[in-house]
């Protein structure tokens, strides 16, 4: 659960979430 979310953020979510903030 947490591991999958972190891997996804490193991919694209992360990038998208950082730009939105």
Swiss-Prot record:
GO terms for molecular function: adenylate cyclase activity; ATP binding. Keywords: ATP-binding, Lyase, Nucleotide-binding. Its EC number is 4.6.1.1. It is an enzyme of class 4 (lyase). The keyword Metal-binding does not apply. Disulfide bonds: none annotated. It catalyses: ATP = 3',5'-cyclic AMP + diphosphate. Coiled coil: none annotated. This is Putative sperm adenylate cyclase. It comes from Mus musculus (Mouse).
């Amino acid at each position: 659960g947490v591991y999958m979310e972190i891997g996804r953020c490193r991919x694209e979510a992360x990038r998208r979430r950082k730009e939105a903030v």
